[in-house]
C-alpha cells in the first residue's frame, strides 16, 4: 500500500485518523459530528451523555487504577473477595471433574487439560500493586493536551516493558470495570471488583443466585481456556498443540454443532447470527452454565435450599443467569453487534444457550411441545 498509494493520500489518511481519534475531546462541533456518526447512525442513540459523564469516563480511561483504588476502598468489602475465592475454587474443581468424565477425550489430552486448569492464575478484585502515575503531568491548559500526555505516558509505559520478563501480576482491566477476562498467553482469569455487584453478584443472596450469575461468569472465563482459541495455548501460555489428532477432530465436530445452531438464528428480518465469529464466546457460555450448575448442586447437596416465591433453587439458578443478560437494545445496535461483536446478543446468550443444557429442561419441565425445546441429538456437548 505504501508503494502504491500517493503520498498526499497517505498524509490525508493519517490526518483524518488523528482528528477522528481526537474528535470527542475537541470543540463542540467536532464532538457533535463524532456523536452523530458513531453513536446516532451506527448505534441508534438519541442523545449524547451529559458532559460530566463523558469527563468521568475520560478520567477512568486515563487514570484507571487511581479511580480503581478509590472504588475498592469504598465499595469492595473483604468478605466479597473471600466469597469469590470460594466460588472460584468450587468452579475449578467442577470443571476438573467434568474434564475427567469426558467420553470423547483421550487420557493423554485430559492430563494436559487438567494441568492447564490447575495452573490458572486467578485475580480477584484488584491488583496487589497499584500503578504509579507520578510522572504523568496533568495541566489546566487543554483537555486534548492532557489526553495527548496521557496517551504518551501509556505508550512509554508499554515500551518500557520491551525485553523484560512478563509481569503476570499486571492487570489488563481496572478494578471498577464491570467485566471479566481470560488471557491465554498468561493463562489467567480475572474478576475485577466492578463485576462483583448486582445483577452478577449479591452478598445477601443465596447460592442459587450467585452460582447462576457470577458463577456462570467464572465458569465462562475458565472455559475460554479450552474454547476454539484458548485450547491452542498450553498451561504456560505458549501457542502449542497439546491435543491428539483424534481429540482435536472430536472437538471440532462438536464445536460445529454450536456454529450451525447459532447460524440458524434470525436476529432481525433477513439478518442471521454468525456462529463462527461468536463460537468462542458461545462455547464459554455453554461451559460456564454446565460447570457452575454442577458446582452449585455439589455445594448445596448437604443443605438443600428452599423454594422461594414459588421458585425452586434450580429455577432460580437459571433465572439469575437470564437476568444478567436482560437488556433493551436498539435495532441499529442489533445490526452493529451482529456484524462486529464476538459475543452473541444478550437475548441469544440466554435463549440460545439454555436449550443446550439438560438441567434446564428438568428445572422447568420443558417438553417437546415448548418452543425452545431442542432434541437431545441436536444439543451441543463439549465441556
Regions found by a protein language model. Give the residues of each.
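Noncatalytic, helix-rich "gating/capping" subdomain that lines the substrate-entry/channel surface
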Residues: 1-86, 90
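Intrinsically disordered, low-complexity linker/terminal regions across diverse proteins
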Residues: 49, 53-56, 60-383
Amino acid at each position: 500500500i505504501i508503494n502504491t498509494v500517493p503520498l498526499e493520500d497517505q498524509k490525508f489518511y493519517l490526518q483524518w485518523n488523528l482528528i477522528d481519534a481526537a474528535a470527542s475531546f475537541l470543540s463542540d462541533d467536532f464532538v457533535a459530528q463524532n456523536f452523530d456518526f458513531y453513536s446516532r447512525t451506527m448505534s441508534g442513540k438519541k442523545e449524547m451523555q451529559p458532559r460530566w459523564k463523558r469527563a468521568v469516563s475520560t478520567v477512568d480511561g486515563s487514570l484507571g487504577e487511581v479511580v480503581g483504588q478509590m472504588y475498592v476502598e469504598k465499595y469492595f468489602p473483604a468478605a466479597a473477595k473471600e466469597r469469590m475465592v470460594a466460588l472460584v475454587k468450587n468452579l475449578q474443581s467442577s470443571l476438573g471433574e467434568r474434564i475427567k468424565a469426558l467420553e470423547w477425550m483421550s487420557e493423554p489430552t485430559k492430563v494436559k487439560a487438567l494441568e492447564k486448569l490447575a495452573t490458572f492464575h486467578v485475580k480477584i478484585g484488584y491488583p496487589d500493586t497499584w500503578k504509579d502515575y507520578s510522572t504523568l503531568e496533568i495541566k489546566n491548559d487543554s483537555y486534548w493536551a492532557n489526553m495527548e500526555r496521557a496517551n504518551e505516558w501509556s505508550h512509554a509505559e508499554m515500551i518500557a516493558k520491551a525485553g523484560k520478563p512478563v509481569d503476570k501480576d499486571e492487570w489488563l482491566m481496572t478494578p471498577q470495570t464491570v467485566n471479566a477476562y481470560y488471557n491465554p498467553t498468561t493463562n489467567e482469569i480475572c474478576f475485577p471488583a466492578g463485576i462483583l455487584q448486582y445483577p452478577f453478584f449479591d452478598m445477601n443472596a443465596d447460592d442459587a443466585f450467585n452460582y447462576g450469575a457470577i458463577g456462570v461468569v467464572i465458569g465462562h472465563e475458565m472455559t475460554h481456556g479450552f474454547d476454539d482459541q484458548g485450547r491452542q495455548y498450553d498451561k504456560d501460555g505458549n501457542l502449542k498443540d497439546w491435543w491428539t489428532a483424534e481429540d482435536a477432530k472430536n472437538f471440532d465436530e462438536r464445536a460445529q454443532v454450536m456454529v450451525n445452531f447459532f447460524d440458524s438464528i434470525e436476529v432481525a428480518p433477513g439478518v442471521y447470527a454468525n456462529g463462527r465469529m461468536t463460537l468462542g464466546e458461545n462455547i464459554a457460555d455453554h461451559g460456564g452454565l454446565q460447570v457452575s450448575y454442577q458446582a452449585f448442586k455439589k455445594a448445596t447437596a448437604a443443605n438443600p435450599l428452599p423454594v422461594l416465591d414459588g421458585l425452586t433453587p434450580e429455577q432460580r439458578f437459571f433465572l439469575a443467569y437470564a437476568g444478567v443478560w436482560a437488556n433493551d437494545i436498539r435495532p441499529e445496535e442489533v445490526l452493529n453487534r451482529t456484524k462486529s461483536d464476538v459475543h452473541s446478543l444478550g437475548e441469544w446468550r440466554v435463549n440460545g444457550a439454555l436449550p443446550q443444557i439438560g438441567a434446564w429442561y428438568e428445572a422447568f419441565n420443558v417438553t417437546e411441545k415448548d418452543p425452545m425445546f431442542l432434541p437431545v441429538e441436536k444439543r451441543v456437548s463439549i465441556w
